[in-house]
Amino acid sequence: MEAKTNNAKIKVVIVGGVAGGASCAARLRRLDENAEIIMVEKGPYVSYANCGLPYHVGGVIEKESSLLVATPDTFRVMFNIDVRTNCEAIRILPDTKTVELRNALTGEVTSEAYDKLVLSPGAKSVRPPLPGIDLPGIFQVRTVPDARAIREWVERGSLFLAGMDKYC
């Protein structure tokens, strides 16, 4: 990563904090100890073992905490990275090099300037337009909260049918 020519530190905003975003943030820190790095993640968790989610649903991985590779505190203490969870990038303004962020808990919208912007927002499950697709008991497994919802459904004694082609 190139340093700014006027001795100011470079500011990088990373959108997405799971696999790609978290890896990028850690690598950027190794490349530049002085960079200001901000990683924003729409969900409540960063850097988790998403390929382990089906195993957590099935009880092979019992503790949800076992899925968490790193926490926002880990990134702050070990890498000096500002991690903002429950924070969604809602608009990118390339002409002014700013990104608008919405706090999912408060609804507050803020603007963050950047020198470099990395987009690693992850994927979204395809939900076919089928009748009943939004009924209770229809789940997808992409995030830790998704896996938790399925486990809670099953623990209540509700029936559950799982099917997938390939996950990871």
Residues covered by each model-derived region:
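FAD-binding core/adjacent interface of flavoenzyme oxidoreductases
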Residues: 1-13, 73-162
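Beta1-alpha1 glycine-rich phosphate/pyrophosphate-binding loop at the start
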Residues: 2-82, 88
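Hydrophobic/small residue at the entry helix of a nucleotide-binding pocket
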Residues: 19-20, 165-168
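Short helix-terminating capping/connector loops at secondary-structure junctions
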Residues: 33-34, 161-163
